Structure formats: C-alpha cells, structure tokens
Design a protein with these regions (language model features):
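Active-site lid/adjacent beta-loop-alpha segment flanking the redox-cofactor pocket in flavoenzymes
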Residues: 120-212
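Short loop/edge segments at beta-strand edges and connector loops
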Residues: 6, 55-57, 199
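Helical element adjacent to the flavin cofactor pocket in flavoenzyme catalytic cores
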Residues: 25-84
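Active-site-adjacent segment of FAD-dependent monooxygenases/related oxidoreductases
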Residues: 1-9, 13, 22-36
Length: 212
C-alpha cells in the first residue's frame, strides 16, 4: 500500500504541513494506537483468557532442554518451563539471549516525547520525518503527541577516550534537547508555533545493528 507522493498530494492530505515537505511516502492503511490503553487492553484480555503475570521477577538466564529453549530462570532461583519461550525484553534481550550462546547486536537509543495542549483539528494521519528528527500524530481530543531524537543528547562523558567511540547508554537529555525538537516540529508544522507543551518525558528504545 506504500507509494511515493509529490508536494501537491502531500498538501492535499495534510494542508498544514509547510513547504519544507517536497515529497513523502504514503500508506493509507497506516495507523497508530495509544500505547497505554492498548497495553491495558491486551492485559485485561489476557487475564480473561487465563494468562498469569509475574511482576518484579528479573530473568537471570534461559536454559535449553534437549536442544530447545524450555526454561526461564529468575534471579531468585525460580524456574519456569514451557514448550515455547518468547523473549521480548527490548534492549535487555541481548544479555538474556547470551545465556544460551546467542548474541544479537543491539544498542539503545534515547527518545524524547512531548504532548501539546489541545489544538484545532489539523491532521488525521501518523507522520514522521525521514531523517528521524521526529514523528507524531494528533489525538482525537486535539493534542499532538511527538517523539523525537534531536541529536543534542550527546555529551562529552559518553565518549571513551581510549577508543574514541561513544557509549549510547550515557546519552542524556538536557536544556537543549526539547527546544531543538520543537524547532524541528515548527519548521514542518508552522501552525504549532505558539502551542504550549503540557508534558514531556524521555526513555530508551532498542535498535538492532541492522536498523530494525
């Protein structure tokens, strides 16, 4: 369903985008979901289906039985065993997978998010910048939600002088990161120039070395 569109069609779909946008990839079947309500929905439905959840239960290792991953060992020594084990621990999956001899090259990316005050209806689609400066959408009640990587999260302390390479785990936000992200957003959506930010936060994203 994905196709490339020119500036004219971009403006037909999103008239509030600035002239900075001269083309885009467009997928009419794309969408977005509120992560809080979606996660809660999955959780409630899983409970109805008999799923049990264990919180505050850090995983120490996986273990194979007859060549197949069957056991999950917790830090306190508790062992769970099943026919199928699914590893979905984000960046921490790498350390857990290493316990069975598998290494998945991964790194952590810092992502800063912000929510604006309620705005007039402007945009119906999920959108983002190809250079990954920001991505976002307008909610049903009018606020905009954006995620961004401004490039200003780098600090001198994250560079190991012996190798001259950066340690992504030492990325931090600072007084420049949010304002830099806002400037990028304003350049593409000028109508948000005077919008107030209701709240912002940041967290880690996991990324494999192949960019997935």
């Amino acid at each position: 369903d994905v196709r490339m569109i020119d500036e004219k069609e971009v403006k037909e779909i999103c008239p509030y985008l600035s002239d900075e946008v001269i083309g885009a990839s467009w997928c009419p079947t794309d969408g977005h979901a509120n992560p809080l309500t979606t996660t809660l929905g999955y959780y409630k439905r899983a409970l109805e289906m008999g799923v049990r959840f264990y919180t505050d239960a850090p995983v120490k290792a996986l273990q194979k039985v007859k060549g197949k991953v069957r056991k999950v060992i917790l830090n306190d020594g508790t062992v769970f065993e099943g026919e199928t084990v699914i590893l979905v621990a984000g960046y921490e999956s790498r350390e857990i997978a290493r316990t069975i001899g598998i290494d998945i090259p991964m790194t952590r990316l810092i992502d800063e998010c912000l929510v604006t005050e309620m705005q007039p209806h402007m945009i119906d689609v999920m959108f983002g910048c190809a250079t990954a400066d920001f991505y976002g959408h307008q909610t049903h009640h009018g606020s905009f939600v954006f995620g961004s990587d401004s490039g200003w999260e780098v600090v001198d302390e994250m560079v190991d002088p012996s190798t001259n390479t950066a340690d992504p785990s030492k990325l931090i936000t600072n007084s420049m990161t949010l304002s830099a992200s806002c400037r990028a957003i304003q350049s593409y959506i000028p109508a948000l120039r005077d919008a107030k930010i209701v709240r912002s936060w940041c967290g880690w994203l996991d990324e494999a070395f192949d960019g997935v």
